[in-house]
Amino acid sequence: MPDPKTTAAITAVGTYLPPDRLTNADLEKLVDTNDEWIRTRTGIEERRILRDPDKATSDMATEAARQCLEKAGVGPDDVDCILVATVTPDMVFPATACLVQHKLGASNAWGYDISAACSGFLYALTTGAKLVESGMHRRVLVIGADTMSRIIDYTDRTTCVIFGDGAGAVLLEPTTDGTGLLDTVQYVDGSGVDSLSQPAGGSLRPATHETVEARLHHVQQDGKAVFKRAVVGMADAAAEILERNGLEGNDVRYLVPHQANLRIIDATARRMGIGPEQVMVNIARYGNTTAATLPLCLGDWEDRLRHGDNLVLAAFGGGFTWGASWLKWSYDGTGQGT
């Protein structure tokens, strides 16, 4: 009889949200918008903002990772690898993962960053899972963290109403009980570069007086183009995961969608044939936290989950990047939930 297959299971979740809230009423004072317009088009009511000028993405990531390890009963020295998904690193280099490794005290871990915008956590989860499945590592921390408030133009109502700050982390460990990350589909289409980007700050447009004055170091978005592609991309990827694995909507306990826009989430759920009670949605409270949305959902719903629950994670981000994963949950929550 062959040995059971080793997969990578999520064994703990940790989250961090800055204490300061930016409400729709607050934004009404900054730009020409209103609460009804924002809620109707995005589903967002408030978002968290990291206001401390001495704190950055690595600090939020470290707090989420620390909570995750404490819940797992694992010490920092027992972590083999740290993967950080982010588009708002503390600095261009070194990698945010290096800073987290130091702040966490994970002296035996190596790691690096993954930049795939709102799909970043999904990509990092796949990468971490392969490190575990291969037998190379036993414990991999996968973190999604972004401080979007630092790259948002708060005079641009098309972007400032959408984004917030936060971090989430999961610990991946090997299992042979049939749970864990079971399948993934991922895609890239680089023709979307001009639809969603931070144009300046890299080697193409390094910082100059001109780039700063032109506000090219802030997020630039063609909202209509992104919405059109995101609706199709997330829904198609989620449907593909079901079809590849002989699953139907009623086999799925929860869809865990990237929290970009409530209308995109609803379209993905309809394509999968699942009801609203099967969808994790916290966008009203946090907005779009980019790479942190998926682990923040897992953190909010962790106590409701049961061993063997089928989850479908789906995301779409700048690039364009998109994909979906089938994850079978590996432990029982407390039964309380968010």
Regions found by a protein language model. Name each.
Residues 1-53, 156-228, 232, 236, ...:
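Condensing-enzyme catalytic core mediating Claisen C-C bond formation in acyl metabolism
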Residues 11-14, 85, 115, 140-146, ...:
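Short beta-strand segments
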Residues 133-167:
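Flexible, glycine-rich active-site loops centered on histidine and acidic residues
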Residues 58, 62-65, 69, 88-89, ...:
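Claisen-condensing/thiolase-fold acyl-transfer catalytic domains that form or cleave C-C bonds
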Residues 10-12, 38, 68, 79-82, ...:
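Buried hydrophobic positions in well-ordered alpha/beta secondary-structure cores of metabolic enzymes
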Residues 31-40, 91-105, 142-148, 203-211, ...:
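Acidic-glycine-rich active-site phosphate/pyrophosphate-binding loop
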Residues 71, 75-107:
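Anion-binding (especially nucleotide phosphate/pyrophosphate-binding) glycine-rich loop
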Residues 77-85, 249-258:
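Short glycine-rich phosphate-binding loop at a beta-alpha junction
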